[in-house]
Amino acid sequence: MYYIGIDISKFKHDCVVIDNSGEIITPSCSFTNDSEGFMQLKILLDSLDAETRIGLESTGHYGMNLKLFLESNNFSFMEFNPLLINRFVKSKSLRKTKSDSIDCMMIAHYLMTVEYKPYPALLYHTEKLKSLTRFRDSLIRLRTRQLVELTNILDKVFPEFKSFFGGKFSVTALYILSNYSSPEKISNMNSKSYDALRKVSKGKFSTVNFAKLKQLAKNTVGNTEDYLLQEMQIVLELYSQLDSKVDETEYSIEECISTINPPMLSVPGIGIESAAVILAEFGDFSKFKNASQMLSFAGLEPGYFQSGTSETTGRMVKHGSSYLRYALMNCAQTVVNYEPTFAMFYAKKRSEGKPHRVALSHVVKKLLRVIYTLQTKNLAYDSNFVR
């Protein structure tokens, strides 16, 4: 048996091969993160005359192309949390020496100590979903930032506007700002303008509100200098562009999810976007022995400390993916809203005196057990089997 440790970096990767006894078969060597380097690695792997096990750290997008290359050439591999490798290194030596050659050696040695669980064959879909869901999150953050900028500008141009709409930027509010770009134009809106607003608001924008808004615009204390109006239009255009890109990304996510069709979608309250994040961040559910391991992977388990007679439990450890924790907590809330069994469980925890977020974290634990069962056994959700 040969154990291959690969240390991932941006422009090159380092690799070492050892045998069962830890003896070095191929000393640490580097190969570039391109087709030439990958072929160099393939030649090395093909030359080995026994079964091989490959281990590498989970280091974001730098290793994605290498993983796809290994999968396409029928080489299995196992990914490790960098924190586990770091702790393993510290357990072996007190010296603070670090290099890529040492790292790949430590990965190979750590690979020898654990049960080998190769990365799933659904790598392409998993990586695609992870990239799309994280990109969607980035777009939404950028889009939200434009609304903050818009608020700052409106505080100068038309400070009465946002409070008139309840402090929110509704579809109607954004339509008015995009089509009537100054308080003066808003104050001069006519009956045709109102007809358009009624269509946009689906009949919710009344004539009384229309008259009030025009009056506010007429008497505003805002500063309507050209440069401020120009800034506002640019921000509105950016928001519109980002909004359309979010829609495009969500469509791509839906296409990918429809190909996989995960059983967790049968749980009331779990939508496509949340299911996509959960599936992308967890990857292969079969690599977890139980739902408790999934909870630990997500960083949602409480910290625990015991020494002598002292024993304490603390807050969530919050290791792992913040995207995953956010998605699970959001799912827990919607499942409570749509599924009576989970609603009763949440109410029970609240009746025990637990705060909202703590009670919701208990719902997450219960939900994860359900998701784990559905995904590993390929079952549809049935509330009769949930206790």
Report residues per predicted region.
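A detector of single, family-specific signature residues
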Residues: M1-R387
